[in-house]
């Protein structure tokens, strides 16, 4: 009888805890991100402000004013110029190239290695456009591994309703958005 009572108490406690922490707040890494079918690369080109990102090694020195500038190269690759402000107040930048991986240009591989080293295998990161609004003003970018995620906007600020909508899309794709860091944009 005591064993039955203990089992009931434990089961009830687990049920109560599960109600306090709904499953929707946790990342489901079994859910695979899906890139949009296609993007108009000419409309996508230009300056984007980072609104939020998942922490990563490559951005460890960036504390504010992170932007990405995309340009179309003659060979149909995409020029990438990422810039940010460091803790010391210095602007730093990194130049790279993105290589389209599908006909719709929504899946790319990006390399920031010097041009002579970009041929080295396994040195390019995934850049998938997971969502973009029809006017190309807001975009959600990630990849299949759930390691990288960015919310980008054409303006330095994004209204909360739009931010929450893109956050929900990221959750639906299995990203742990509790780790997302909002980017300070002072320019």
What do these predicted ranges mean?
Residues 18:
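A cross-family signal for key residues in well-ordered alpha-helices
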Residues 3-6, 10, 21-187:
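A beta-rich soluble binding module of mature secreted/lumenal proteins
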């Amino acid at each position: 009888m005591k064993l039955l009572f203990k089992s009931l108490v434990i089961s009830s406690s687990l049920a109560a805890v599960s109600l306090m922490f709904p499953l929707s707040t946790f990342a489901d890494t079994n859910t695979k991100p899906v890139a949009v079918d296609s993007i108009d690369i000419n409309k996508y080109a230009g300056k984007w402000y980072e609104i939020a990102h998942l922490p990563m090694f490559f951005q460890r020195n960036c504390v504010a004013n992170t932007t990405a500038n995309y340009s179309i190269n003659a060979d149909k690759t995409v020029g990438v110029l990422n810039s940010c402000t460091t803790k010391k107040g210095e602007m730093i930048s990194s130049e790279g190239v993105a290589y389209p991986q599908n006909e719709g240009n929504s899946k790319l591989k990006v390399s920031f290695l010097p041009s002579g080293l970009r041929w080295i295998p396994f040195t390019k990161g995934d850049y998938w456009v997971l969502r973009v609004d029809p006017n190309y003003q807001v975009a959600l970018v990630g990849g299949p591994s759930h390691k990288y995620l960015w919310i980008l906007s054409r303006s330095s600020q994004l209204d909360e309703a739009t931010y929450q909508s893109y956050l929900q899309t990221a959750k639906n794709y299995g990203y742990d958005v509790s780790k997302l860091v909002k980017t300070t944009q002072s320019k």
